[in-house]
Amino acid sequence: MEQTLKGDETGWWVVSDAVQIWLPQGELPCGTATKWSLQGKTARQIGEWQEQPVWLVCQGRDTDMASVRQLLDQDVGLFQLAGRGVQLAEFYRSHRFCGYCGHEMVRSKTELACLCHHCKERYYPQIAPCIIVAIRRGEEILLAQHNRHRGNMYTVLAGFVEVGETLEQTVVREVMEESQVQIKNLRYVSSQPWPFPHSLMMAFMAEYAGGEIKHDPKELRDAGWFRYDQLPQLPPPGTVARRLIEDTVVLCRAYHENEG
């Protein structure tokens, strides 16, 4: 439930303008509302971290606003809560008015939703399901440079789930569309909320089954097979992409040792 801060409330503070998050000294603020000049602001508790509440304040600040990506090297639980706050701030920003009748909406007091009292419509935060997959061929892993990524970073293939697809069908389709490679022995690994802007990444590993790499230039700048000990620049630690690559490297090394 939302409440007006009196000043003595304490915990972690996710202060977001729906795009960025407030990170004074590069860290998520912790302490009392008064310490961070938040008294009088409207806040909602969105979770707990280290036995302290995590509060969301939907408001920007004049300084120290940054991407939640800066928290990637923090504990995964803290990053997820910060990402949750940014996604909720964006949800509230984009759902001020009802998409059916145009009337102003109110935030639910009992759940994470926006309500229209005029037409009784109810809106929940959107989540975009995505797959991400590491493909192994012997002692090599398929990595690609995505057009949307800056610098020379290579990562595994990924894409959004389409209407009516299973996750497994999405993996096969995305891999074929982006690389023209066939896969086998697909298995689920883990998932990661990804607040850019509101995705849920579902991670898989697979083995190469056939085909020659022919990357889609609309999606990728480059794609190729890389030996486990000759890898290019990789995604940062804390990402599910990095975990997939590291797990695949273990399999590649074991294959090399067994074959050698």
Swiss-Prot record:
CC cofactor: Mg(2+); Mn(2+); Zn(2+)
Recorded superkingdom: Bacteria
Record's keyword terms, sorted: Hydrolase, Magnesium, Manganese, Metal-binding, NAD, Zinc
Statement: the UniProt record of this protein carries the keyword Transit peptide: no
Motif (Nudix box): 159-180
Binding positions (a divalent metal cation 1): A158, E178, E219
EC number: 3.6.1.-, 3.6.1.22
Record's keyword annotation contains Magnesium: yes
Catalytic activity as recorded in UniProt: a 5'-end NAD(+)-phospho-ribonucleoside in mRNA + H2O = a 5'-end phospho-adenosine-phospho-ribonucleoside in mRNA + beta-nicotinamide D-ribonucleotide + 2 H(+); NAD(+) + H2O = beta-nicotinamide D-ribonucleotide + AMP + 2 H(+); NADH + H2O = reduced beta-nicotinamide D-ribonucleotide + AMP + 2 H(+)
Functional note: mRNA decapping enzyme that specifically removes the nicotinamide adenine dinucleotide (NAD) cap from a subset of mRNAs by hydrolyzing the diphosphate linkage to produce nicotinamide mononucleotide (NMN) and 5' monophosphate mRNA. The NAD-cap is present at the 5'-end of some mRNAs and stabilizes RNA against 5'-processing. Has preference for mRNAs with a 5'-end purine. Catalyzes the hydrolysis of a broad range of dinucleotide pyrophosphates.
HAMAP family named in the record: Nudix_NudC (MF_00297)
Self-association and partners: Homodimer.
Protein name per Swiss-Prot or TrEMBL: NAD-capped RNA hydrolase NudC
Organism for this UniProt entry: Pectobacterium carotovorum subsp. carotovorum (strain PC1)
Taxonomic lineage of the native organism: Bacteria, Pseudomonadati, Pseudomonadota, Gammaproteobacteria, Enterobacterales
Chain's gene name: nudC
